[in-house]
Amino acid sequence: MKKVFLMLIVVLLLFSLAWARVGDVVKVIKAPGPCPTGLAFDGRYLWLADSRLDKIFKIDPASGQVVKSFDTPGYHPEGLVWDGKYLWHIDSGERLVYCLDPETGAVLKALESNSDRPRDLAWDGQDLWLTDVRNKTIIRCSPVDGMMIQQFSAPGAEPAGLEFDGKYLWVTDRAMDRIFLVDPATGWCLSSLRSYGPWPAGLAFDGQHLWNVDYENDELYQVKVFDSDIMTLWDEKELELRLVKEFRNYGPGLVTSLDIYLPLPADRDNQKLLGPVEFLQKPAEMITDAWGQKMAHFNYRNLKAPAVVQPGWSVKARIYAVEYFIYPDRVGGLDQIPEDIKKKYLVDGDKYCLNDPFIQGLARKIAGNEKNPYWIARKIYEYLIDHLSYNLKPVGGWNPAPTVLRRGTASCSEYTYSLIALCRALGVPARYVGTVSLRGDEASLDDVFHRWNEIYLPPYGWIPFDANKGDVETPGGRALGIGNVAARYVITTENGGGDKYLWFGYNYGFTWTAEGKCRVSEESYGEWQPLGPKKYQKPLPRK
């Protein structure tokens, strides 16, 4: 019976590992000390520093048992890294980098860190890297004399753990509770994972998994970072959304015809409908546009002043924050993009002007000889952030891409037009999605709306790219505009632009004709209400 039970446990363990996705924790080891900081992997064993005990532990990752330990050379031990022969260690109080004999713990070399507040170390096969929490930077330095070779901004305000996986750096940020993938050549944050614990500290890479030690939980986590399943869901909410398109004729003339088109939300990764879409008025018909978007068509005739119509719909939905982790080297080439996707999402449009010499020249200038779809889109994304600033009407609105890129300001719609134009000009399929957004509280009204791009990256499919959201100073903030959708949207529209119903718009489209002079007004808005029990703020009872 015991053998059967043990076999069942083994089978369940193997099954869980097989179904683990990117970001999943596949193993947890209890730290041997109360204040774990730095972490390293030597090809067989983990090494862990503890800042209260002033010790470095050698740990068997298979069993979690301590193999040996020795005292640290200083009294504020933090970062660790293995260079293939020696253990390097950083002391944040002394601000020194030590090269240690892994057998005895003896100091073989001590270097000035050239950092105000060093925290962790990485080794790229030639040079050392370290995080400087006070200056919010990542520093590359010489293992010979400690002198700085390169420096760039850290992902956020609290850089902690650091590791090199053979191509990219990994950096934890304790304020953002994230682990960022960073390009050491540019300093760009490429993607990120939410940390499993609340205080992500040291990092180590074992060739397949990333190890992260959590300073608050006193645990070591083995994290899966390579898998075909790159999506995770977070922050579930259940809400009801009511979308209304209001049209008024104040006269004195007659509105002879009015056609309103309302695209309908459907199940997507970030949203699951809890029931059918319900209409405030019965539509004249249901139609599907050239992009496959389903929508309701409302038709009105001879609206005499004063007249008002308010077609719309409501839906109950479960919405999520959705995150896709993109490791650039695992993205396929342009030749791996399906032909039907290319045929549909590489076409020109009035807002894109793909054949404009300005668009063609700028696209080539930005991308150079790059062939990886991720890097093409990412370079364009960074260009838009560096050269555009957010500005709505009267300066901006829905101008075509060449106008926007020359002007240097953009609405969210114009960010999307510009990214679509430059990506399509280089053979990367791009489209946009339109949404109704929560504005602050879950009971709120949205009359501004929002849209962003989706870029086709093989083999994963459509990945969100929101250059408007990513237009911030911190590298980590920029990364959150790619592959991340917050739990505050219902996506109504999935479109390539230029169809006869929505044109290059989203959430609604409308046309009207009139006889005589007519003063008309129109507005669109989404009303949100949370589902479930009411919420109250109550003080704690006195004991």
Question: Whereabouts are the PLM-identified features?
Answer:
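Beta-rich, blade/repeat-based domains predominating
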Residues: A31-D42, P73-D83, N114-G125, P155-G166, ...
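Conserved beta-strand positions in repeat-built beta-propeller and related beta-rich domains
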Residues: P32, L48-L53, H89-E94, L130-N135, ...
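Intrinsically disordered, low-complexity N-terminal segments that are enriched in acidic
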Residues: V225-E323
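Short loop/turn segments that connect beta-strands within beta-propeller blades
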Residues: D60-G64, D101-G105, S142-G146, D183-G187, ...
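Hydrophobic/aromatic-rich core segments of domains that either
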Residues: E414-N507
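A short beta-strand motif characteristic of beta-propeller blades
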Residues: D24-K30, Q65-F70, A106-L111, M147-F152, ...
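Acidic low-complexity segments
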Residues: A307-R406
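Blade-level signature of beta-propeller repeat domains, shared across WD40, Kelch, NHL, RCC1
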Residues: W199-M231
